[in-house]
């Protein structure tokens, strides 16, 4: 079996890269070869690293049974038009490789991610244009155009929404299997006419042996960024974008700054809202710039610290940094999603502080998950946009440290019972095996 990947991203600075890495290790253990076509990476890389990647256009890794073909593409940047153009040009090149490249033509099945949203339609065209009509497995991590409606970028019935729905239907109709990351996703696409037998639910797992609790006295991030170990920390880890409701988070931090100076917020990541957030905090608060030993820069604005993405090998330190960790979004954004960072929070034995749309996440955090007979509360859930309830949830955990620890232990147990790396990767293996002849 030989698997073809046509991707707009490659490298360790993609949020879900550990999932792909775990999955691909499982594929290699089956004796399956993998062929990748992708643009030269730029996300999270220095100029020197980008130049180096452009020189090394084909990467062979016999141990991992992978061949990665990179084609030259301009850097991603933060401008939305520039990013959209990069995605479009990349998709055109990937289509060309998928149909005509010798290495791609020797593959038996395609495994395609849903990000960016045109990837599925591109893969469907590859399938149609190849004589062998190569089977196409679609991994649905984000539902488009629903996500655009949720962020307020468009509305149902608009021209953009109609185009998005056509792309969505074309993709679903041509996919041989669709892997979704939650029961909510499954219900969503079934309501759009996708037959149930085409859908497989595979939750985004966490490597329970990699993401573990790191005691505060051993957590190196406190020393790297000059954080006071005696404070109560609320952390956010991931994309700092337009949908994460950073405005509300800043309002809550401002309100707690005087009444509860021991509560400190730490945001680890980057994204489209990063520059706006830094400018906003600079205009309101006193800034302290921190130079970490590795050369990276961080900022502290009174009771809010902004740290850059950390290497994956430090993921346990990142998710163990806080006393509690956030899963947060604007209303309407997360109706059908359970962010995979939730599992990392739980695996690190930290309580989940969720301010999110009411969906499967609420059941899991409150301990009412129908998918587990042993589920117990592992945090506090509040409705997306409810600032007062969110602030009250923070104070509840701040005033009851034993409850924090209990929720953390419950979350870790839920992961061990339901969301281990072995369970998730085996489900992917089973899907691929269904296409073996």
Q: Which residues make up each language-model segment?
A:
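Nucleotide-sugar-dependent
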Residues: 14, 244, 309-318, 325-346, ...
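Nucleotide-activated donor-binding/catalytic signature segment of Leloir-type glycosyltransferases, i.e.
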Residues: 274-316, 378
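Conserved donor-binding/catalytic core segment of Leloir-type glycosyltransferases
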Residues: 227-244, 250-253, 266
């Amino acid at each position: 079996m030989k698997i073809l990947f046509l991707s707009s991203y490659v490298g360790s600075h993609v949020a879900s890269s550990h999932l792909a890495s775990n999955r691909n290790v499982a594929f290699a253990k089956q004796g399956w070869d993998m062929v990748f076509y992708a643009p030269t990476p730029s996300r999270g890389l220095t100029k020197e690293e980008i130049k180096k990647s452009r020189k090394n256009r084909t990467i062979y890794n016999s141990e991992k049974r992978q061949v990665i073909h990179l084609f030259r593409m301009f850097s991603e940047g933060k401008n939305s038009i520039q990013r959209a153009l990069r995605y479009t040009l990349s998709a055109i090149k990937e289509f060309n490789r998928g149909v005509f490249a010798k290495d791609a033509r020797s593959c038996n099945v395609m495994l395609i991610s849903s990000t960016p949203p045109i990837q599925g339609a591109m893969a469907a065209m590859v399938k149609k244009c190849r004589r062998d009509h190569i089977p196409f497995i679609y991994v649905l991590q984000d539902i488009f155009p629903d996500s655009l409606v949720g962020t307020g970028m468009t509305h149902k019935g608009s021209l953009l929404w109609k185009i998005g729905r056509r792309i969505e239907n074309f993709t679903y109709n041509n996919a041989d299997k669709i892997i979704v990351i939650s029961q909510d996703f499954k219900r969503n696409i079934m309501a759009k006419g996708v037959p149930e037998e085409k859908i497989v639910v595979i939750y985004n797992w966490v490597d329970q042996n990699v993401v573990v609790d790191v005691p505060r006295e051993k957590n190196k991030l406190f020393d790297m960024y000059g954080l006071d170990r005696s404070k109560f920390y609320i952390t956010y880890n991931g994309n700092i974008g337009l949908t994460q409701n950073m405005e509300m988070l800043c309002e809550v931090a401002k309100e707690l700054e005087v009444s509860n100076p021991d509560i400190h917020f730490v945001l680890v990541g980057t994204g489209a809202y990063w520059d706006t957030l830094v400018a906003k905090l600079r205009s309101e608060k006193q800034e302290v710039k921190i130079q970490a030993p590795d050369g990276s820069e961080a900022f502290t604005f009174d009771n809010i610290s902004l740290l850059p993405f950390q290497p994956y090998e430090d993921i346990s330190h990142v998710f163990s940094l806080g006393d509690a960790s956030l899963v947060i979004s604007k209303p309407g954004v997360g109706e059908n999603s359970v962010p995979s960072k939730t599992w990392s929070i739980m695996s690190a034995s930290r309580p989940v502080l969720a301010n999110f749309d009411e969906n499967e996440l609420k059941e899991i955090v409150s301990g009412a998950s129908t998918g587990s007979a042993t589920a117990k509360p592992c945090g506090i859930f509040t409705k997306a946009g409810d600032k007062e309830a969110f602030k009250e949830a923070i104070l509840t955990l701040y005033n009851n440290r034993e409850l924090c620890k209990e929720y953390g232990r419950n979350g870790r147990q839920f992961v061990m019972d339901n969301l281990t790396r072995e369970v998730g990767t085996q489900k992917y293996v089973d899907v691929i095996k269904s296409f073996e002849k």
